[in-house]
Amino acid sequence: MTGRRARIGVMGGTFDPIHHGHLVAASEVASQFQLEEVIFVPTGQPWQKAERDIAPAEDRYLMTVIATASNPRFTVSRVDIDRPGPTYTIDTLRDLRAELAARGLTDPDLFFITGADALAKIMSWNRAEELLTMAHFVGVTRPGHRLDTPTGLPPDRVSLLEIPALAISSTECRERIRQNRPIWYLVPDGIVQYISKRGLYRRTDGGR
């Protein structure tokens, strides 16, 4: 249907590697906000993590495709990894709107999913005030953490949601791999196999 209005989730992240916490968070937000689709957007060159070595963008993209393949509401976009230079959310949302318009979704309601800790710092993001006009921001956090809307943010543009599976982190997954400890059940089975085949995260000297 051309020109129809849709509710679309956007989950940007390094996904280094993607894990079940990401997937459960996306699924819960989709359910709570009645989203038709959640688009996962692996970052190209994340400006917040410029000092940390990360896996190649193509590996992170392919892992995200593998991890999301079984859910028909999940899709993956290359808009960030195909764009040169640092990744800023303002560019992600702009390019996604163009991508969605090409599919006939000319005026979607976007719901940007991020960690509640990152949401608390949103006013330091590039063109933050404009960002808040482009999407509704959903901050996800693990149980037991306070769910207070950050001061100064418009309450009608920001929501907070508790997600049980967020006890998992990509940092923990990388450390377990470096220590030769298993990551089964922390990440999808296909990701365990992909990481093993590609030899990702094994070295601590910056090699891959």
Curated annotation (Swiss-Prot):
Entry keyword annotation includes Thylakoid: no
Domain of life: Bacteria
Record SUPFAM superfamilies: Nucleotidylyl transferase
Family: Belongs to the NadD family.
Protein name stated in the entry: Probable nicotinate-nucleotide adenylyltransferase
Record bears the keyword Nucleotide-binding: yes
InterPro entries: Cyt_trans-like, NadD/NMNAT, Rossmann-like_a/b/a_fold
GO biological process: NAD biosynthetic process
Catalysis performed (reactions): nicotinate beta-D-ribonucleotide + ATP + H(+) = deamido-NAD(+) + diphosphate
Phylogenetic placement of the source organism: Bacteria, Bacillati, Actinomycetota, Actinomycetes, Acidothermales
Function: Catalyzes the reversible adenylation of nicotinate mononucleotide (NaMN) to nicotinic acid adenine dinucleotide (NaAD).
Enzyme Commission code: 2.7.7.18
UniProt pathway annotation: Cofactor biosynthesis; NAD(+) biosynthesis; deamido-NAD(+) from nicotinate D-ribonucleotide: step 1/1
Keyword set, alphabetical order: ATP-binding, NAD, Nucleotide-binding, Nucleotidyltransferase, Pyridine nucleotide biosynthesis, Transferase
Class of the enzyme per the UniProt entry, highest EC level: transferase
PANTHER family: NICOTINATE-NUCLEOTIDE ADENYLYLTRANSFERASE-RELATED, PHOSPHOPANTETHEINE ADENYLYLTRANSFERASE
Organism: Acidothermus cellulolyticus (strain ATCC 43068 / DSM 8971 / 11B)
MF terms in GO: ATP binding; nicotinate-nucleotide adenylyltransferase activity
